[in-house]
Structure formats: structure tokens, C-alpha cells
């Protein structure tokens, strides 16, 4: 078969396979067009689950007569004009494929009128390559799109449609998702001439909350926590459910990026990680989250349905969302009231940048959205950014390099009985510790027991060393160094304290400083902001640890340090080399004064009881 260009109608039907999955896909694309046209009231009429008729009517700016024939052409759009526009998508639609794809698999009628025209005009297409004719019509300012007999010319696609009830349920869900993102727009939904939903325009905060309660349920709003978290050009807002009211189905999660509903693994993982210590595998969080960021930092041109996005700095977005979620969940647990801006006009805002308001004068794009984001500072270099993740899932210490693992392997020796392989710590790693430097008193690491303890041998004595105790001891040693390695947080952590916690903070501020923490304090608002933390604690739930320390004041630094280490959580070690690596790292920080504390961690194994059983 020779290579040839596909006929336009066939090409459109192939494109429709990606854009038009089911009637709900048509509804989504048409409503997004209405929103981009600046509509404030959208009517959606459905018949037989959308298979027979989908009618979307809006009061947007309309389409001029001489542009109607272009509206149904492929890759024709008023929303972008250059590559620069593509890199900063402000509208919901931009590909110029929706109407062409829909018209190729249905009988489509488009009627529109602009404010500059005295009469409306109508164009019709019915799934085949033909010249469209424009005829006069009666219509108010705005646009109406009728999609009849969906998939009438592709029987295989129509065969895969589900029942009318199921297809309408998908349409209803699409409208719910859009209505949450656009509270200022009124929506009316009917099915088979029966009114299903009427969402009135919501302008005030009370009206917006009422719309969310209408869509998500009163139970959600009554048990939800409000989020308003900012950092430079990043802004996270919305509502998240309290952990104790988690759901058993993953059916109430709505996430939007710059007003666009999305499904993204980075966001999902950050949210799930924030809830990880509260929920089990059979529980799911519920949330309505709005993420605003510089359009240059997110690529929405990933898939024709525009559900998927790609972040240029995924780790930054992940940690920003995680910290915002964790802050909200932790604040609720400490009974910190969430006040509105009106009730607390002098409140101190979270660290944030100055947003620059600019608009575009490109016809339809002016109604599609505004660029509310300032340009990145010139001295900001993504590639040379010093940012490193300080909250990660399934974190484990860096595994030894192959050369180190080889060195460990060479240290494995076999006893005369050839029953137990032992590993001796290299001399260059052990010269500081008295318990190892003594001749003939060398500790041998023999094995990792159930991933919980190291089996050690010293002459004819055997000991168990708890991995968890060793991990805590390792951190304790690092926090007692004269120069504690610190990591500057790209997103400072803001903590709101109650009166008792703030008094505790004043008593223990020096202890935090000794441990490598760097805070700025706002005494008037009882707030502290963590700017730097010990690098050894970068994977910990640091907000939880700090609040725990403030809930229980400590008079001495040693007691404070013990309480801090008791709150640490570590991943389990799964290999012998990881355990030996941890022991080596701990030993490198040793001094003579630490020997008694280390010796207290060793549990001597008494063999007499077991040997007696062998007789």
C-alpha cells in the first residue's frame, strides 16, 4: 500500500477517537468553549444520555458571521496564534480540534450572534466532507451548539455506549467538576426536558461555599479544612476533608490547575503522602483543590483531552502541595481556628511573591483568562537551583556504591566450621571508637535479623543491635555536632501557634537553634517560620515533630533532644549492606564520650538457655 494523505473526513474521525470518547466528552469540550467565550450563563440540554441530542447554549461573545465556517475547520482557533501563546495557555481550549472532531461523528448545528451583528447566523455539518452553508437565524447574543445523533456514522463507536443512565451520570459529573471551578458562572442542566440541576452564580464567599456544599454534600463542608497556601507564584487553595472523615471510595476528589480540571500523578502522590499517617489503604481523602501557578511552568499540551499536564518542576510542585496539605491537617489537630481575611485583616500572610496583573488584547483570549503571574526573577536558574526534596515517599538512605559493596564483600570471612559468614568493619572507619580499636576486641557484623537488628560478635560474645535504636542514635549524634549540616527550605514552613505553644516556643527556642533549626518569629501573631532545618531531618514530618515538642515543654537540652529523636520515623532496612552502611556512618561521628551510650544499645545474647535445649 502506497503512502497517501488521508481524506479530511477520515482524519477528523481519527481525531474524534481521542477527543470524543463519549457524550460527556462532547459536553466538556462545548462548555469549555462557552467559558472561553466569556459566558456567565450556560444551559445544557440532554436527551437520551446525550446519544440523541446535546444542546449547549451560552451568552458569550459569540462568533462573527465570516468566522463561522472556520469554527468547524480543523486547527482553527481564536485562542492562540504563536508558539509563545502555546507556552502560556490561559484558555481552556486551544487545539482547534473539538468542533471539527465532533461534527465528523454527528449532525452538528452551530448558531451564533455577536453584539456587533443585528442578526444571528447558523452553520450545519453532518459527519461528511462537505461545504458548509451559512444561513440567517434568530438567536440572542451568544452561541448555541446542537449535537444530534452522536456516532450515527460510526456504528462501532455507538455500540460501545452504555445505558442512557450511565452516560448521563458521566455528563453530570463533568458539569459538577466544571461548576466547582467556575463559581461565577450559572449552569442549568436538563435531561429529557426534566430540570436536574440549577447552579446559580456564586460571587461572595458564602455563595461559593454553598455551591461546594451543593455539589460535594453538606457533610463534606462541615468536616472540611480550608487551605490558603502561597509561595511566590504558587498558590494552593480549597478544602480538604479531616482524616477522621475519610471516605471508603475514591469518588470525591477535584483538582484544578489554573482553573482547568486535571488528573496528575504528582499531585495525587503529594496528597496521598500528606494523609499517609492518618489513612490506611482502604481509606481515601476527599478534597477540592485549586492550584494557580505561572502558565510557563506547566505544559497542558500533553493529550487531546487536556486532562493530563506536565510540570517543569514536578518536585517543587509536589513538595509545595505536600506542605500546604500537611499544614492544614496539622493546624486542625492543634485546634487552630481558620479565620477569613475579613475577620482578620491584619493577619500575616504566608511567604509569597508579588503578583503582576496583565491582560491580553487578543479578542477571545481576553475573556478566556488573565496572566496573573509575574515573570521569574532573572537570577533564577532552574538548572542550578539548590532545591532538593525534603519530603519523599518510601525514602531510604543512599545505598552504598558498587565499590563500597565490593569492599564489604571482601571483608566476608568464613569460620572453620564454615557456618557463619562475618563482616569486619574496615580499619579506616573504626579508628575513632575505643570499643573497636582495642586489639582482639573487634566487633564483627554477622547478619541482619528480620530486618530489625544486626547480629554482632566480639570475641566469643554475641550482641543484637536494634536497627531502629541505631537510626535514632545516628541522628542524635548528628544533632550534637558543633557544625550541623543544614538545608534551606525553598518553601519556608509557617506554623501558627496557640498561646500555650508560643510560650513553650519561647522557652525552647535556644534548644531548636542548638539542634540546627533556623526560625523567624512573629510575636504579634504567635507565628514562627522555619527557614532551615538539619539536613538529617529533611525526610521527616517536621511540622508534626515541632508541634509535639511545643506541646510538651522541656527544661534541659538532653531531654529536648531525646523527645525530638523519639518522634523520628525511619524506613526499614532490607539488606545487610544497608545496615552495615548505617553502622559505619554512625561510627564516623563517634568520640570516646559516646561509647557508654552505644554500649547501652547492645543486647547481649546468653546462649546457655539454648544450649541446654540441645542436650
Curated annotation (Swiss-Prot):
Molecular-function annotations in GO: ATP binding; ATP hydrolysis activity; ATP-dependent DNA damage sensor activity; mismatched DNA binding
Keywords: DNA damage, DNA repair
GO biological process per UniProt: mismatch repair
Superkingdom field: Bacteria
GO CC annotation terms, alphabetical: mismatch repair complex
Pfam entry (one): HATPase_c_3
Membrane-spanning parts: none
SMART domains: DNA_mis_repair, MutL_C
HAMAP family: DNA_mis_repair
NCBIfam families (UniProt xref): mutl (TIGR00585), PRK00095.1-1 (NF000948)
Its biological purpose: This protein is involved in the repair of mismatches in DNA. It is required for dam-dependent methyl-directed DNA mismatch repair. May act as a 'molecular matchmaker', a protein that promotes the formation of a stable complex between two or more DNA-binding proteins in an ATP-dependent manner without itself being part of a final effector complex.
Family of this protein: Belongs to the DNA mismatch repair MutL/HexB family.
Protein name stated in the entry: DNA mismatch repair protein MutL
Species for this entry: Histophilus somni (strain 129Pt) (Haemophilus somnus)
